[in-house]
Every structure is written in C-alpha cells, then in structure tokens.
Amino acid sequence: MNNDKARPLVGIILTALSVLLVVGVLTFAKPCDVHGVPNSCAWASRAVLGAGIVSFVLSVVRIFERDEGERRGLCLGVALVGILIACLPGVLIELCADASLPCNAVMRPFCMGVGIALAAAGGGDLTLRLVRLAKPNEEK
C-alpha cells in the first residue's frame, strides 16, 4: 500500500480538531459569565485555548514534515496536548459548582471530547508509525 497520499490525512484531521476546539471555546463552548468577573471557568477556558493553539501549530507542522522521526514526535506531542485539553476543565482547573451553567454543561464535555479525539488520532498515528518502524523488511 502506498502511504504517500495518506500521510497528510492524519495531520489534516488533527488540524481540523484543533480549529474546532479553538473556535468552539471562543464561540459556543464559552465559560459561564459571573458578573463579568474572571473566575476559574474563564481561566480554564483560557488554558484550553492556549493548549488548542499549541495543538494547531503541532498539527500544521505535522502536515508538512517529511522526516519520519519528527512526525512521530509531533504525533506524540499532539496526543499529550489532547490529554491535557481533556483534563484541564474540571480536573486540573475546577469549574463552577452549578452543573447547569455553560462551563459544566457545554465547555467541559466539549473539551473532553475533542481532547480525547486529538489524543486518539495522534496516539493512533504514532502507534502505526512505531509498528511500521519495528518491521524493517516491509514497505514503509
């Protein structure tokens, strides 16, 4: 099987997920607004936004990178950032106690879903690349 055409596919998927995360946190998955005062939900949103931008940059570089070792490193980086994104709201940074507010009802599940998808895509690509690396006699 010729993998030359499939190589940028994972990078494009990772980039699309990263863009979805950044746009989502800025639009429909916003944190709650308690009297306009920055609270822990706003800080969690900012942390997710920053991690989403890092994921976007790694994903774009992953599309154009030709070195196999660097691609594996970029996949690992995106997978780890995806795990971080999934854990930021509610696990690493506490959110509001009210489960009906947007931070708990929308932002947290959205970030968990996209973060897990980023981790799965990056980790899956890394695993496939490591399996191909372990089989030196087969076509890469």
Where are the model-predicted features located?
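Cytosolic juxtamembrane helix and N-cap/initiation of the first transmembrane helix
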Residues: 1-20, 128, 140
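Short, Lys/Arg-enriched, Gly/Pro-containing loop segments at transmembrane-helix junctions
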Residues: 133-140
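Loop-to-transmembrane helix junctions at the membrane interface
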Residues: 61-83
